[in-house]
């Protein structure tokens, strides 16, 4: 190969990597082989910088059917059914081309779920942008990016007939050069009918199904394993182009196939396309494979083996069928007007042998590529910025104008209702949505098959994680689980999407290592194992890294859907109770951001055992019928939580606390507001005492104002800002 140095640079391979490849092959690689190694050894596919930290996560429990290592995680939800779910990032593509980047992110995560045999029933997203309130070019750009991402998520999800039932948004300057788009999908399957990405049985046919292969997405996995600079727009050809109608056909064809006994395994073609799907299937099974690339359905002329192996064209799957059933498999996909071709077979060689019009164009041992990518032990160093920002302190002044402070927080984009966003999503399709977007806290979806409901929520406060990555990650796990618990459900498991800056920066690797320790500790205590996930590194532009953003999505089970607990006031005269203890904790808070205009101090400190006690208390109280509504206290503190419950329930409240002024906006964790009928108060207090949970009456529901201590605001005024304010910011009105 000519000009080896430039070739290695374009493939993001080092000289040491190249020498390792030569050692594996026993010769110099050709271009196809180099491309395969480049993709599979990329950060995006191999997790070479992060795997050592991920190994510490708790992944097992009695209810876990499948943990990390497959296309998605699987948990038992009773009566012979399972929930299949995962969250993944599509950050780099969405910054380059927001509509297609976000759309194909949704399509990719849905394929990960239905390739396991599950019908997708709900989606969430966690999306983060720069400051959309700015009146400069940065603000203008991020309003454009926001519009494109939201349109892409809605455009794909709506066509698939899968409801988008919730999500999370945040806005920080650290995302000015790198937005984050994290997509989550959950599906339902029979627990004894889960399909895996395997290719076993010598002589079994390998079948390509779905859309034709084009040149879109070429080099996508490698692109997602590097930082950006001002030339990022030139990477637009590496962004995949989605066709949701083709994916809808693929979904239905796959679900029809799963009712047969024709196949051994199936794998989505995601990052690195045909390369990753074939090597992963063979690698898991300890087998080899022969593939004839000239048989791959192509939509462009003159495509080469290199392009066919590395294209990331969407809506494609690779199937290992049972020998003799080839025609039956092909018949199903052709009925759904999809391409389907036998392109190879399983072998016992342990090698991937690729042919092009009868001539061998590549021969690579499977395991060194799929399972044995060189792992990196990158240096870590505590960031220099920590000493400075922690020294700023986070103690807010006690003498404040409560009304002025409340209105600043109430008018923040993080607080306001996002109907401008979720009105573009179909949240009710499939008619199973009990609590959708706009309902506050966790979303809730009915499982008609067993009468239960599944609660889900995606959460992370990147400001906490910047101040203290370990505590911030713990708080993300706890917040996500608490949003599920206030629906009356028991949190069972999590999927994560770990978004960080460049791993080549020792300070970023320190943040990553600390966050992983926090997740590990929280999941162990809270009994929510990690069953799937994703790592997105190199979220850096022109040397500026994003805040550590370990997005956590928790799934919980409510055995009886009719016991669903909502987050809006229900009845005038009901009592309001605060569960948990409030301290003066403002590091990384919305109050600190909006009122004081800085970021400093330390993140709130969480007692994980107290958090678990809160979850179990909420579950028991709801099961006993003691609760009318419940709301997590988090961003903006108690005052904002009460404001949201008032607006959502269209009822005011009268609250008196023992808190001093600004502590109404404290973000101490492990707290919730409960609405209860007075007849249940004594029993609830007894239950709280038994569970070791702090509980106190703070007021009642009623009136047309939000009244909290000396603060009194008309509900009508709050509704106007809450319901219409976000749209005004996005449209720059």
Curated annotation (Swiss-Prot):
GO biological process: 'de novo' IMP biosynthetic process
Binding of substrate, residues: 89-92, 111, 240, 312-314, 536
Ligand binding (Mg(2+) 1): 88, 534
Family annotation (CDD domains): PurL_repeat1, PurL_repeat2
Coiled coil: none
Primary location recorded for the protein, binned into one broad class: cytoplasm
Molecular-function GO terms, alphabetical: ATP binding; magnesium ion binding; phosphoribosylformylglycinamidine synthase activity
Cellular component, GO annotation: cytoplasm
Family statement drawn from the similarity comment of this UniProt entry: Belongs to the FGAMS family.
Descriptive protein name: Phosphoribosylformylglycinamidine synthase subunit PurL
Biological source species: Wolinella succinogenes (strain ATCC 29543 / DSM 1740 / CCUG 13145 / JCM 31913 / LMG 7466 / NCTC 11488 / FDC 602W) (Vibrio succinogenes)
GN (gene name): purL
